[in-house]
A protein has these predicted regions:
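Helix-adjacent hinge/juxtasegments
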Residues: 57-107
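Short amphipathic alpha-helices and their capping/turn segments at secondary-structure boundaries
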Residues: 20-21, 64-79, 111-123
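Structured helix-beta-strand junction loops
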Residues: 27, 56-57, 77-78, 121-122, ...
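General N-terminal targeting signals
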Residues: 20-22, 47-49, 77-79, 98-100, ...
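Conserved P-loop
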Residues: 2-74
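Structural motif
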Residues: 4, 80-82, 126-128
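A short beta-strand-to-loop transition that corresponds to the Sensor-1 phosphate-sensing loop
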Residues: 36, 85, 128-131
Length: 156
């Protein structure tokens, strides 16, 4: 089974996703695919909170800022996978190096293909994404490209 959770920032999506991934696992291995590459103290604090939330839930954390399928090559496909988050994964693919100032034109396609391949390879997966489309603000070209790319990936 594949489950997609989308919503506003910091509203409990990850906690819900953890509960669902545990239920889906039915005693099988649980994997938490952590996609955030921390850039500052706020990111590190969020990572600490998420780790504390998972404490006792028996998730094996797989750090996969990019190339998810390569990162899980030794994982059990019958296990339960929680990918948190599609939003961070897309950012990592669009800007693959810390100094990248222009988005990689193939980043969104690569991200989408990785996620579709993950769906094909594993039995159960829960995907977390941020809903960033409802504020009605017109953004610069880079941000609009990111928003369009995330919407395209979320629909997959």
């Amino acid at each position: 089974m594949k489950i997609f959770i989308s919503g506003g920032c910091k509203n409990g999506k990850s906690s819900l996703a953890q509960q669902l991934a545990v239920k889906l696992s039915q005693g099988k291995k649980r994997y938490y695919l952590a996609t955030m590459i921390p850039c500052d103290g706020e990111d590190l604090a969020r990572i600490r909170r998420h780790r504390a939330d998972r404490d006792g839930l028996e998730f094996e954390t797989v750090e996969a800022g990019r190339n998810i399928c390569a990162a899980i090559k030794d994982c059990d496909p019958a296990g339960s996978y929680l990918l948190d988050s599609v939003t961070a994964l897309l950012l990592n693919e669009l800007y693959p190096t810390p100094t990248a100032s222009e988005p990689d034109p193939d980043g969104a396609l690569r991200c989408r293909q990785e996620l579709l391949e993950l769906c094909d390879r594993v039995e159960n997966a829960v995907f977390v994404s941020d809903y960033i489309y409802a504020d009605g603000i017109a953004y610069d070209a880079y941000t609009e490209n990111y928003r369009r790319s995330l919407a395209w990936i979320d629909r997959a």
